[in-house]
C-alpha cells in the first residue's frame, strides 16, 4: 500500500508492449494513489486496439498493490478534439473520436475522462458553448456506460472556451444527463486565466455560485511559469512557479476535495520526472528538491 495519504498521483505513460500494466508500475514507483493516461498519442487520433489480457493483468496488479488505483484511473482525451469549432466537419470528427475515447476509458476500468472543451475560433463564444454541449449530449447518448466527461478549465490561449466558471457552467448546464458530466479544475489554467487560487476555499466558494462542488471530479495540480492572467498555459513544477508551493499544498489537503483525484502534469527536470518527490513534498507540506 502507498505511504501517500493524499489522493494524489500523476500523468504516466501508456506505452507499447505493457500499456496499462506499465502505467500502474510507473504509478507505484512514484507512490501515487491515482494516475492519468492518454490511451494513444495526445496530438492525433491514431489508436491501437486495447489488449484485454494486459488490462486484466493491470487490474490484478492494482488489487494486489494498491486498490485505490483501480478506483481512481483518469483518462485524458486527445487535444485535437474541438467540439466548439464553427466547422461542422471538425465537430463531427471530434465527436466520433470522443465516443471512441469514452469506450476505451470504460474498457480500462476508468470512469473519468478529461476533455479540453474546445475553441470558438472566429465564431461567437456562446455559439461555441452550445456546440460543445450539443456534442457532449450526442457522445453520452452514443455510449452505453457510466463514464463521466470532465470539462477542463482552460488557461485562455487564443479562443479557448471554458476559461472561467461561468463558461464551464454553461457547458455543464447544457448537458442533459448530469450523471455523465463533471469538471476538471486545473490550478495552472485557473491561475493563467486570471482566477485567484491562493485560497482554495474562496475559489471553491466562487465555483459554487455556478455549480455544485460535487461536479468537481478531477484536479490537475500544477504550478505555473507565468504571472496570474497571462493566458499562457505553461506548467511548472510544484513550488518552482508563480502559484507557489504553500498555495498548492492547500489545494492538495483541502477537505472538500479529499475524494477527488489530484493529478500532477508537471514538467521533467534534467529529462526526468520528479513526480515522486513532488508527491512526498505535498504530503509532508515541506518543500525539498
Swiss-Prot record:
Cofactor(s) the protein requires to work: Zn(2+)
Key words of the record: DNA damage, DNA repair, Endonuclease, Hydrolase, Metal-binding, Nuclease, Zinc
SMART domains, A to Z: AP2Ec
Tagged with keyword Zinc: yes
Disulfide-bonded cysteines: none
EC class: hydrolase
Binding site for Zn(2+) 2: 152, 186, 220, 265
This enzyme's EC code(s): 3.1.21.2
NCBIfam families per record: nfo (TIGR00587), PRK01060.1-1 (NF002196)
Function: Endonuclease IV plays a role in DNA repair. It cleaves phosphodiester bonds at apurinic or apyrimidinic (AP) sites, generating a 3'-hydroxyl group and a 5'-terminal sugar phosphate.
Protein name per UniProt: Probable endonuclease 4
Gene name, Swiss-Prot/TrEMBL: nfo
Amino acid at each position: 500500500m502507498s505511504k501517500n495519504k493524499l489522493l494524489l498521483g500523476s500523468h504516466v505513460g501508456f506505452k507499447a508492449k505493457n500499456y496499462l500494466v506499465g502505467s500502474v508500475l510507473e504509478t507505484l514507483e512514484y507512490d501515487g494513489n491515482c494516475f492519468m493516461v492518454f490511451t494513444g498519442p495526445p496530438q492525433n487520433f491514431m489508436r491501437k486496439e486495447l489488449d484485454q489480457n494486459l488490462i486484466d493483468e493491470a487490474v490484478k496488479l492494482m488489487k494486489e498493490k494498491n486498490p485505490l488505483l483501480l478506483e481512481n484511473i483518469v483518462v485524458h482525451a486527445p487535444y485535437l478534439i474541438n467540439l466548439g469549432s464553427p466547422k461542422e466537419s471538425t465537430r463531427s470528427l471530434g465527436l466520433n473520436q470522443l465516443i471512441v475515447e469514452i469506450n476505451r476509458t470504460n474498457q480500462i476500468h476508468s470512469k473519468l475522462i478529461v476533455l479540453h472543451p474546445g475553441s470558438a475560433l472566429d465564431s461567437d463564444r456562446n455559439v461555441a458553448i452550445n456546440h460543445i454541449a450539443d456534442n457532449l449530449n450526442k457522445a453520452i447518448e452514443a455510449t452505453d456506460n457510466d463514464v463521466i466527461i470532465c470539462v477542463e478549465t482552460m488557461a485562455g490561449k487564443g479562443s479557448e472556451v471554458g476559461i472561467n466558471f461561468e463558461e464551464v457552467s454553461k457547458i455543464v448546464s447544457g448537458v442533459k444527463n448530469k450523471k455523465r458530466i463533471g469538471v476538471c479544475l486545473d490550478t495552472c489554467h485557473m491561475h493563467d486565466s486570471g482566477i485567484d487560487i491562493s485560497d482554495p476555499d474562496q475559489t471553491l466558494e466562487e465555483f459554487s455560485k455556478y455549480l455544485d462542488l460535487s461536479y468537481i471530479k478531477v484536479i490537475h495540480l500544477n504550478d505555473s511559469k507565468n504571472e496570474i492572467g497571462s493566458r499562457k498555459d505553461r506548467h511548472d513544477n510544484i513550488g518552482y512557479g508563480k502559484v507557489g508551493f504553500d498555495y498548492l499544498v492547500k489545494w492538495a489537503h483541502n477537505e472538500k476535495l479529499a475524494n477527488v483525484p489530484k493529478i500532477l502534469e508537471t514538467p521533467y527536470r534534467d529529462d526526468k520526472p520528479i513526480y515522486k518527490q513532488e508527491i512526498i513534498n505535498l504530503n509532508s507540506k515541506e518543500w525539498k528538491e
